[in-house]
């Protein structure tokens, strides 16, 4: 497994070791001891799976209380996955990092608590699966506007994204409730 630090402190890009043979492939998509050693602190308490059509953009989401660390990957298709640093005390506060995660490159991203998260679906359809370190708490959920100019995420968009009503009404970064 290869682990790389990204432009956002604590956001890690993970390249698992793939064991391919004439049957297909095998890899350990999470393993407590190895991932803990790499700095991916658990424990994980919830697994999620979403499916999105091309052009669907979900995010930028975070929970102001019960913040979630997320270990994310695309198990079908491809997405452009983004983490935004929302920790005022962080050296990379306000910065974002974006990476293509796909069923072909099998990359994963570790998004620690304190970061916002979102993704854009690049393929006709994408299955997105992730482990979370805290339970979903809708009362604490917050959404920052996906195209906030102060953050300036470089989404690889071809036209307008498809958004939920909640995401279309995301809060500007400058007005958002953030972490200390
Ligand atoms: C996130 C979540 C949603 N739901 C429900 C609420 C709603 O009826 C439906 C769809 O919810 P949403 O529109 O919030 O789903 P979605 O936009 O996919 O939300 C997710 O976006 C990505 C970017 C993240 O980082 C995740 O943490 C999560 O916020 O699923 C749960 O039951 N549990 C959950 O953990």
Question: Could you say what each language-model-derived stretch is?
Answer:
Residues 1-107, 123-125, 130-180:
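Non-catalytic, conserved peripheral segments adjacent to functional cores
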Residues 109, 117-122:
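Short beta-strand His + acidic residue motifs that chelate non-heme Fe in jelly-roll/DSBH
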